[in-house]
Amino acid sequence: KSGELLNLNKNNNFQIEKLEGSNCAVCECENNIGSNYCKHCGADLYEINDKSQFESIIKNNKSINYILEKFNIGKILLTSSLSLGILLVVSFFIKGFISLEFSEISYIINPLHIIMALNLGVLDGYSSTMVGSGSIEAHIGMLILLIMPVISIIISNFIFLKKENKDLNSVILNSIGFGISYGLMLAVISIFATVKSNPMDMIDYGLAINFRYRFSSLLINGFIIGFLTTYIFSFKKKYRNNNIYIDILKNAINTIAIGYILVFIILLILTLSDSSFLNEIGLYGYLDKFNIGIILSQLTAYVWEFANFIPISINNNIISILNTGIFFNTKLIFYSMIALSLLIILISGCNIKYKYKENGKKAILIFAISYAIIMGILAMFSYITVGGNISLLEMNNYKASIFMGTSITSTMIISFIYSYVVSWIGYKLNTF
C-alpha cells in the first residue's frame, strides 16, 4: 500500500531491476526512491529482465532475424561507420601535416593508412631490387594514438547506441556487436589499402616497395578497442550487482586504470623536477623528438608492468626486478612503483571481501583472470617493434631489430599469479 520495495523472491532466469530516476514513466509524477509502484497511478517502477538471453536464443533455436534484432545490427553498423568516418576526417588533417613536414614519404601514405595506424595495426613491408629482397615488420604501439579512436567511438555511441543500452544484457550484446563490426571494417580496409610503389629515382635499380597492414592485427585490435570502449562507456553502477563476472571485470579495469594514472602523475612530477632518470633508461634522447606527454604515456605502461614484476625491454635493455642495470636513485623510483601496485591490488582484494564474502575464492580467481587479460591487452597495444632484413643496393642485407615493451604471454602469466596472491592477501586482511 505504501509503495515501498517488497521482498520479492528471485527466479533463476529473471531478475527485477529498478528503473532509473524516481519519476513515473506513465504519469511523470515523482515518487519516493525505492518505491516499487507509482503512488499516483499504480504503474510499475521496475522492469523484469531475462538473465539468460544467450541460453534462450540457443535452446529455442531462434531465427537469424531474432538474433540480429537482439544485436541491434542496424544501429551497430551505423555506429561503426560513424566512428570510422570521424577518424577519416581526422586522418585528412594528419595527412596534410605529413605532406608539409615529410613530403618525401607523403606520397605513399593515404588517410586509410593513418586510420589503421591510429588503431595500432601491424605493418608488413617488402622491398625488392634486381640484386636482392628484404622484409620488415613494424608495430608502433604508442598508446597516445588510441585517443582518437576512443573519442570517435564514444561520440558515435552517444549518438546511436546509448538509448539502446537498457540493461546489462543489451550493454554486453551491443559491446560485442560493435567490437565485431568495428574490427571487421578495419580488417576489410586493410585489404584495399595495400601500397605498391616504384620510386622514380630508384627505377634504374628495379626497386619495388610493397607494404600493407596485417589483416589479423586490425581485426583483433578493432574488436578489443571497440568492445572495451563501448562497454566502459555504457556500463552503469546499477549493473554492478547483477553479475559477478561483469562486476569484477570492471573492478580489474578500474584497478589498472587507477595504477596507470597514478604512475603517470608521479613520472610527470619527477620528469619536470629532474629528468635524469630518463637518460639512464635510454629515453632522454627522445625528448627532443617527441612531446613529453607522448613519452610518459608510453613509459607509464612499461613502469606499471614492471611494478607487477614483469620484465620490460626499453631500447633493447632488459629491466627486471633481478636485473635493473640502473643507478640507485632510479631503482628507488621503480621499486616505489612496486609498492604502489601492491597497495592498489591489496585494496582491490579488500573490496572483493566486502562485496563477495560467500564467494571469496571464486571472486579472487575471476579478478586475477580479468586482471591478467587486461594486462595482456595493455602489453599487446604498448609494445614497439621494428625488425626484419632490409635489402640495400650494395647487395648487403642489414638486419636490425628494435623492441620496447613486454612479452604478452609472460605478462599474462606473471600478472595472473601476482594479482591472485596480492588480492588474496588483501581479501584476508579485511576483517570487517
Task: Please report, for each region that a protein language model flagged, where it lies by residue.
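Transmembrane alpha-helical segments in integral membrane proteins
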Residues: 67-86, 134-166, 221-241, 329-357, ...
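Transmembrane alpha-helical segments of multi-pass membrane transport proteins and ion-pumping complexes
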Residues: 84, 88, 92, 96, ...
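Intrinsically disordered, low-complexity cytosolic tails and juxtamembrane linkers
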Residues: 48-71
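Acidic, serine/threonine- and glycine-rich low-complexity intrinsically disordered segments
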Residues: 236-295
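Alpha-helical transmembrane segments and their helix-start/interface "positive-inside/aromatic belt" motifs
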Residues: 63-89, 166-180, 245-261, 357-369
